[in-house]
Amino acid sequence: MKYIDEFRDPVKARILRTEINQLVERIETARRRPLQIMEVCGGHTHAIFRYGLKQMLPPAVEFVHGPGCPVCVLPMGRVDDCIALAEQPGVIFTTFGDAMRVPGSQKTLLQAKANGADVRMVYSPLDALKLARENPQREVIFFGLGFETTMPSTAMTVLAARREGVRNFSLFCNHITIIPTIKAILDSPDLHLDGFLGPGHVSLVIGTRPYEFIAGNYHKPIVIAGFEPLDLLQALWMVLKQLAEGRSAVENQYARVVPPEGNSAALAAIHEVFELREFFEWRGLGSIDHSGVRIREAFAGFDAEKRFRVPNLKIADPKSCQCGEVLKGVIKPHECKIFGAACTPETPLGALMVSSEGACAAYYNFGRIDISGLRGNAGGTDRRAAV
């Protein structure tokens, strides 16, 4: 299949591995400690483990898993807000599938559905708008979630609802932005990153230029990467080449998809419907300035937070859950005390174990870790062979 098979060629992967090993030998920092490369996107984390790329690379290269999974960074209080909205009389609450199982303080949306709330999984905000047209006597709320990748479809759905005069449709907006998040990570004293693999899908919308501050102000290389094995290996090679040459720049490995200027139509829709919040709360990362968006006043009639009662309470994560440390790259998923024991994909306590893009789920499903050898740092039984 074009653009798939050629990016999974094992011969080329081995060639790239050899060249990566040679580059690492040229980087002085790698002689003192492992090079820490953050893959921002949860899709990259999943691909790294699915294809066994971590096992291909030298010990001197260490992936740090970033906060690029929107379901995973959703604070518990916002999940409770979703449940409160879903349980109001006459409401049909619609959401993407991953969000159904994210734990709130008492239950998940899936459990609220089992208790009688009308919660429905959709594949697009347009599905929610269709439900609103078909059920004019009901209030249909769409749970808007995701980075700039999903913002355009949400914005265009709100524009369509206004154009068609659909008054029983509203949006519970939890969209978040990637650039302030990366800046917050770079400003964190807990991390000492050497470079970044930039997100592919977000960059398709925003382009490559917004990342220039990473190279210009923080002197860190960043390479926008695709999602196939050779995409990630080549992007890593490009990051290491910058480090070996003592330079920092924004480079685009995913040029077959990502233009430097992004998608102007998508950006126009985002800017028409949304504006930046002063701050937004992230699970595990706390409050980050200008890291979320809200609906502009011109579209207030479609804002569920203005049309319905929303508790909007700040709720701390369970003490045993270490999603925050994992999201910041301070610990690896298997170093969490409840990984693989109390917290599994079947019974997740933390959001990182819920989504297929979450780092904990990726480690659990593809990490090739002998959990039985981690007792004291992580519980659980031996469910896969160690490598």
Question: Where would I find each of the regions flagged by the language model?
Answer:
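Short, surface-exposed amphipathic charged segments that create phosphate/polyanion-binding patches used
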Residues: 78-81, 133-140, 184-189, 211-213, ...
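A conserved active-site cap/scaffold subdomain adjacent to cofactor or substrate pockets
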Residues: 172, 190-259
